């Protein structure tokens, strides 16, 4: 029954999706501001030279002047880039855990909160790359050993002074229950960055993001980085499964991406317990839905990312063996013809 419902929900988008999935992509440069400054300085030197006649000394002076201005422009460009990046709060390696103060808490839905933690200095950035995460650590008074859990911040990597986390409260989840009990002013230990999948612009022509619940956070980190970079022309397809409509996290942000980049970003939502008015997928993510909306495995430079609860991994891609071992590819993606190299499990 769900298979028919899911496909029926996807049909109005199918022809649009296939058109969007086959459009060409192109790359671009990234140091435009720096090069523009350099060109302007060189142009100023050329103007000076052309208005000084044939005097050799003046020609030599003009060359020196142009060189000095070019160096100045490069220096200014570098300082702007470095200033934009800022100092990193998390540097990895032997840094160890850092204690951060909770600045604010916002209720998102019935079981999820947004936590904003202050970085040690107001002009610092997190230091996270795409895609990477942070470890959190907490040890209660009666705990024999600390609880350590990974989280992917939803704040932009360029944001200064804070990080944001979306945390869903799970029954008997030591870390999530502790965080949901925290109030502003309290502190939590963090360590990172923990590298996941190193992303670079146009690394793949098309990526698919298959997420369940709070498994959406690394997917959002990746999608945001792609669309924040004008040089990155990667196409993105999101399949996001949840229990109820209220559980769909970051939906407004994904709708903004879909409205801004309709030829490059599409999102498909699946609910286990949908309302009567729901027109999207119903039940669980299945083979028929993925075959309809995902990019073809043999015709494009594609990568499929999976992040969600254990049941989703088992059905879609097979489980990871450990954080450093992706395990064998299994499940629906293998049945659809994707190779192990085409799939990454967060």
From Swiss-Prot:
Belongs to the flavoprotein pyridine nucleotide cytochrome reductase family. CDD domains: cyt_b5_reduct_like. InterPro entries: CBR-like, Cbr1-like_FAD-bd_dom, FAD-bd_FR_type, Flavoprot_Pyr_Nucl_cyt_Rdtase, FNR_nucleotide-bd, OxRdtase_FAD/NAD-bd, Riboflavin_synthase-like_b-brl. It catalyses: 2 Fe(III)-[cytochrome b5] + NADH = 2 Fe(II)-[cytochrome b5] + NAD(+) + H(+). GO terms for cellular component: mitochondrial outer membrane. It is found in: Mitochondrion outer membrane. The chain crosses the membrane at residues 28-50. This is NADH-cytochrome b5 reductase 2. Residues 95-200 form the FAD-binding FR-type domain. It is a single-pass membrane protein. Its cofactor is FAD. GO terms for molecular function: cytochrome-b5 reductase activity, acting on NAD(P)H. Signal peptide: none annotated. Keywords: FAD, Flavoprotein, Membrane, Mitochondrion, Mitochondrion outer membrane, NAD, Oxidoreductase, Transmembrane, Transmembrane helix. Its EC number is 1.6.2.2. It comes from the Eukaryota. Coiled coil: none annotated. FAD binds at residues 203-238. One of its GO terms (biological process) is ergosterol biosynthetic process. Pfam families: FAD_binding_6, NAD_binding_1. The gene is mcr1. May mediate the reduction of outer membrane cytochrome b5.
